[in-house]
Each structure stands twice: as structure tokens, then as C-alpha cells.
């Protein structure tokens, strides 16, 4: 497996992975456009991918402008292999090196993602919208978890 920074040429494969997921499914696949992905990768933040045999099997994108994790998705065939954990680590290491001390994300309740974030030490802090759980991570908490 190869972990690397995402580039605009990765967007078609990123979109494929995004649409393969079984949980946190987009109600309308057209809601997240290639242009949205490009903006988040090149203007608002940065992204990373995991490749296996030349195919992208997971990706993560951080949004500096809104101080949130815009996306972290793994092809369901590759879940449980540590890809999400590694992408999260790469992303948060970079994010907190950008003079940021706080980041949040939203995810649907009763999903593998919810359990992943809880296990990773994210703190639940209310709702994001009407149905998503809002999780937060703080730089000092993250760094403490990394060293101990």
C-alpha cells in the first residue's frame, strides 16, 4: 500500500471510492462535484490517498477554511486493514502543523465511522445539522495520544 498526497488527477478515483461506501451515503451523488473536490484539494486544504496496485482504495481531505475533516472514506473491500487509521494520522499530523488547534467532523450515528472516531479519541460535541454526530479533536489531545 502506498500513502501519498492527493492530486487533481486522483479526483475520478476519489469519486469512485466515495460512491462505493455503504454508510454515510450521499442522498444525491451529484452533491459532491469534481470541482468541489478540486477546491478542497488545492484551495481550501489538502488530501491524501491510499493506493493498492495502482488503484485508490481510500482518501482523506482536510478543510483549513472551515476547520473540519471534509472526507475520510475507504473502499468497503479494504475496511479493517488500518488504512483509515493511517490516512487519519497523516491528515491530522499535517493539519495540526498548520497552526490549527481544533478540528471537527460530522458523521452519521450507528455507523462504523462513528465507532472509528470514538476509538480514535474524538470527542462528541452535539449534532451537526439534524442527524449527524459532531466530533471534535484538539491539537493537545491528539499530540498526547500520539506520544503515549
List the predicted regions and their residue ranges.
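Conserved active-site alpha-helix within GNAT-family acetyltransferase domains
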Residues: 85, 109-126, 133
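A short, internal acetyl-CoA/4′-phosphopantetheine-binding micro-motif in the GNAT/acyltransferase core
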Residues: 72-80, 107
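Conserved GNAT acetyl-CoA-binding A-motif
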Residues: 95-108
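Conserved acetyl-CoA-binding loop-helix of GNAT-fold acetyltransferases
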Residues: 80-93, 119
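A short helix-loop-beta-strand connector motif used in the catalytic cores of GNAT acetyltransferases and
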Residues: 38-49, 68
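Conserved GNAT-fold acetyl-CoA-binding loop/helix
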Residues: 15-42
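Conserved beta-strand in the GNAT
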Residues: 49, 55-63, 68-73
Amino acid at each position: 500500500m502506498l500513502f501519498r498526497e492527493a492530486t487533481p488527477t486522483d479526483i475520478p478515483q476519489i469519486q469512485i471510492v466515495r460512491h462505493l461506501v455503504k454508510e454515510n451515503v450521499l442522498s444525491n451523488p451529484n452533491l459532491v462535484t469534481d470541482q468541489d473536490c478540486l477546491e478542497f484539494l488545492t484551495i481550501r486544504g489538502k488530501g491524501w490517498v491510499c493506493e493498492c496496485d495502482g488503484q485508490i482504495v481510500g482518501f482523506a481531505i482536510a478543510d483549513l477554511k472551515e476547520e473540519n475533516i471534509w472526507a475520510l472514506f475507504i473502499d468497503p473491500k479494504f475496511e479493517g486493514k488500518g488504512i483509515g487509521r493511517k490516512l487519519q494520522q497523516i491528515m491530522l499530523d499535517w493539519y495540526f502543523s498548520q497552526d490549527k488547534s481544533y478540528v471537527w467532523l460530522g458523521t452519521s450515528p450507528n455507523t462504523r465511522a462513528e465507532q472509528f472516531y470514538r476509538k480514535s479519541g474524538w470527542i462528541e460535541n452535539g449534532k451537526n445539522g439534524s442527524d449527524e454526530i459532531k466530533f471534535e479533536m484538539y491539537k493537545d489531545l491528539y499530540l498526547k495520544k500520539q506520544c503515549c
